[in-house]
Amino acid sequence: MRFCKKCVMPDTKPDLHFDEEGVCDACRSQEAKNQNINWQEREKEFFELIKKYKKHPVYDCVIGVSGGKDSTFQVVKMLELGLNPLCVCFEPSVPTKIGRKNLDNLNHLGVDLIHIKRDPKVYQKLAREAFIRTGDNEWQNHLGIFTSVPRIAVNFGVPLIIWGESPQIEYGGPASSKNKNILGREWLEEFGGLLGNRASDMLGVNGIAEKDLFLYTYPSDEELQRVGVTGLFLGYYFKWDYKKILEISKKYGFLTLDHPVETTYENFENLDCYSNHVHDYLKYCKYGFGRATDNACLDIRLGYISREEGVRLVQKYDGKPPKKAIKKYLEFSGFSEEEFQKIVDSFTNKKIFKRDENGKFLRDYDGSLVRKDECVLK
């Protein structure tokens, strides 16, 4: 297991590549953001692009929102540019009180908001089956977010969708994907986290019918072409710095916690849903890195902390089971603690974590998995 020489990301991250100097492509991408990209030209390109979309009689664009810092910033930015966005929130798996406050705050910025309250029975069936199949407790929610937004765009006849950061630019990925400014079906299937499991694969599971999957199914090419739907990454056109975005969002009423969230050292991540913290923990079990690593890597690349400090933060915060979030998730999903742990263990990486003579994973005093010596971050 190798770690990037500049940040602290391991080579187990899917689609991440290291060069001959041992530096990951996400770090190289950050260098390009600072040195090779003319952001003024890209901003001009965006301003010219949106002119043709400011013709809709009511809404100029659709924005998928959670009430988080990024979606708050997206709404603020579009309002500043004189656009009238229609906002769409696909209900989180296990909503939080602060998340609801932030969503209400976003609404009160002066936008119409469609809050999709999905059928809880169908949703739970999808959640349970997807977790068993993929080891991803948020598969159904990520799918719902990425399909319901274009569905609303099609049904309301609004051709422009505004997404936030470009994950491949910020977190690394194939070189060809970094120059893509559009989120469409191709991006969803390659990078949307479906893990080889499509909505259609759930047909018939515990009585799930085709009509139950409507919100989880991407609009047809014919529908998209009829409206001319295009989904753009705002992070392709504007230089993305999450701390600056956070400060702007706080200025417009975004709330943070007075303590770190369970899976990292920050107090503003994934505030809308408890289940997201379980998702971060599962990522750690599969790939050996979690949300604290993600945050530390961004902070290192943006120059906010040193790599040495990043190592310290990752060692302190990454990999600890989010006990409160797991409890909330079990109440929502109906899994027992034993069932949950059995599924987690089935997806836990045997190449990274130690096991005893019976094949059982070793755990620390706080329940954290014990890493093999060659997989310890230094």
Q: Where are the regions that the model predicts?
A:
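Short, glycine-rich nucleotide/cofactor-binding loops
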Residues: 61-70
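Long, structured ligand/cofactor-binding scaffold of large enzymes
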Residues: 73-75
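Nucleotide-activated chemistry modules centered on ATP-dependent adenylation/adenylyltransferase
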Residues: 1-61, 77-378
